[in-house]
Amino acid sequence: MLAETASSFTAGTSDNEIAHKHIAIIGAGCASLSLAARVSELPSTNLHIIEPPYPVQADHVWGFWAMEWLDRVRPLVRKSWHKWAVITEHANTVMQSADHPYQAISRHQWLAKCREQAVQNGVTFHDSLDAAHLDRDAEIFDSRPPKVADGVMLQHFVGFEVRAAAGSFDDSTAILMDFRCDQSRGMHFIYCLPFSDRDALIESTMFSPQQAPPQFYEKAISDWLGKIANVTDFDITRRETGSIPLGFFARHDSELRGIGGNAGAIRPSSGYAFAFIQKQIDRALIGVKAGKPLHFTTPHRKIDLWMDRIFLSVIRHQPQIAPKIFGAMASRLSGDEFAMFLSGEATMGLRLKVILAMPIWPFLRALFRPESDAP
């Protein structure tokens, strides 16, 4: 392993005589390229990215709260919001944080920057493992998505980035959840990131086991723009769509060690992945510096995964109470607390505060309800 290889070098060994370790990662998504950009932190390592040919994916906006381990992301942040809102039929709760603003970056820009840094640091790209000509001692990690069974909870969405007249949007406040939309198919909310007073990303997002027809999401966006935001004249400049499995899943290939979502990086209750992938990689590299072998584990604490399992059970069986759940949480927590909880940085006191904000009976029933994907 890396630590063992490093410890075997003698003081008189020249750089040319040092045996480099070969590491390959299958897939060229967020996790593998984020690690590749930091390959200089892996001593005496040749990193190979296995990138089979596949269609170019559309751009996406990734959202997260600013945290210490995300400092390297800051130069690519498209927009920061120190205020964000959770809106139900009964309340509009605006939270704010000076230290942990909500932020957004472009998927394409992040991956391009990581790839550029990786190439500068000698990372090589191949279309197959065979093409990499790895020796038998090479370590292989798999970033392909984990295995997902039918019927699991999904976060699925369609988004429009729109341009409207100046003054159409309040770009000081991100709308994380606006539940004033059709709830007939499951937990459903509108997510709006205003990049300026005329440009915004609006997503129709659902948490449910089944996806809806495209027209359902598109109508929800149009209705929200026209009836809630009072924006009827706009151009769609970009579209995005996606589906993220929520739960606890087996690795893509049980014979290979995982990285990223294939090593438990995706937060089961929210689908947030980008920030947690960076945390996972940070921890792995800290371990390497401490003399441990490179290894990727879930960045989530066991108690948070336990709480996530209960939450997913509630939302699966009683989606109609989702507005009440998130409205209560937003009203009881400060902006900093909200950001820390959803970023996996909660204290026990904060977790208790969240639990006490929840409706008790649905969560008690979920506590004793068996779920097939429980951790």
Go through each PLM region and give its residues.
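N-terminal Rossmann-like FAD-binding beta1-loop-alpha1 element of flavoenzymes
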Residues: 11-48
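Predominantly flavin-linked oxidoreductase catalytic cores and closely associated redox partners
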Residues: 117-235, 247-252
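A conserved FAD-binding loop/helix module that cradles the flavin
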Residues: 262-283
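C-terminal helical "tail/cap" subdomain of flavin- and related membrane-associated enzymes
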Residues: 282-375
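N-terminal FAD cofactor-binding segment of flavoenzymes
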Residues: 34, 38-90, 109, 158
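Short FAD-binding loop at a beta-strand-to-alpha-helix junction that anchors the flavin cofactor
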Residues: 192, 253-269
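FAD-binding beta-loop-beta segment adjacent to the flavin cofactor pocket
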Residues: 184-187, 241-259, 314-320, 327-334
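Flavin-binding catalytic cores
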Residues: 210-240, 257, 278-302
